[in-house]
């Protein structure tokens, strides 16, 4: 029996700015699993659309975005300096570019385009074909890997999430207001939950983690107990 036979797929879904990627990345590092940031993939498509005229003044031209899909190649490369993978579009590093408020304001609209979701879900399923994967997003446990052995659904108070996002962006030198970020968080929640294709929802068998008042270490302690219970022979 190979080592991968003992490993599982872990799906981490939830609201924006809950720290899903940070937590999923920490889980993967702790377990020696592969981490796949699906949110970064949707942000990468959004960035490409912005740079190629498919989004103008915040208005998304869905047909124009669809026409761009065949021109987008998304890859991840491990960055030893960060201890994590960076995302590339057509060979260009875009890790920093996809985290701007401009991308955040449009990513929910782009994510709702059926052709975009179809392309990226297929890519994600291929990436996660082997066991030993931690994947975070909005529809991992419901659409991408509905048979994942362990599913988490992360949530936190919108004001807490907005403050976290504000601190992250201002630390990078971006000029934003807390009010702007909180509005963006609430608008993304509404868009993610109401879209026709793969809306954000908690899988019936997902375990909820509200991390409004938890540190990353506290979340990890909680997770490792859950993981031990779920993987007991």
Task: Put a short name on every predicted segment.
Residues 68, 78-79, 124-130, 138-143, ...:
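Small-molecule kinase domains that catalyze NTP-dependent phosphoryl transfer to phosphate-bearing small molecules
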Residues 12:
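Hydrophobic anchor at the beta1->P-loop junction of P-loop NTPases
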Residues 39, 91, 120, 134, ...:
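Residue-level signal for inorganic ion chemistry
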Residues 30-98:
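N-terminal phosphate/diphosphate-binding loop that engages ATP/GTP or pyrophosphate donors
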Residues 20:
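Conserved lysine of the Walker
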Residues 17:
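Walker A (P-loop) phosphate-binding loop of P-loop NTPases
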Residues 23:
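Hydrophobic positions on the alpha1 helix immediately C-terminal to the Walker A/P-loop
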Residues 94-172:
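ATP-dependent NMP and nucleoside kinases share a basic, alpha-helical "lid"
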């Amino acid at each position: 029996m190979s080592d991968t036979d003992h490993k599982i797929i872990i799906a981490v879904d939830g609201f924006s700015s809950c720290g899903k990627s940070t937590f999923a990345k920490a889980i993967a590092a702790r377990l020696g699993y592969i981490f796949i940031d699906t949110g970064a993939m949707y942000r990468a498509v959004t960035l490409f659309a912005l740079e190629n005229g498919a989004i103008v003044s915040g208005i998304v031209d869905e047909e124009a975005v669809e026409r761009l899909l065949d021109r987008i190649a998304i890859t991840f490369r491990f960055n030893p300096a960060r201890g994590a993978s960076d995302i590339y579009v057509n060979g260009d590093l875009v890790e920093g570019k996809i985290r701007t408020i401009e991308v955040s304001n449009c990513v929910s609209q782009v994510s709702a385009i059926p052709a975009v979701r179809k392309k990226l879900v297929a890519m994600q399923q291929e990436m996660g074909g082997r066991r030993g994967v931690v994947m975070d997003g909005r529809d991992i446990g419901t659409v991408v890997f509905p048979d994942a052995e362990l599913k988490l659904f992360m949530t936190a108070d919108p004001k807490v999430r907005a403050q976290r996002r504000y601190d992250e962006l201002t630390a990078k030198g971006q000029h934003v207001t807390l009010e702007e970020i909180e509005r963006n968080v609430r608008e993304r929640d509404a868009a993610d939950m109401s879209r026709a294709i793969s809306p954000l929802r908690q899988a019936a068998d997902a375990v909820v983690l509200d991390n409004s008042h938890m540190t990353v270490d506290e979340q990890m302690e909680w997770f490792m107990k859950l993981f031990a219970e779920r993987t007991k022979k």
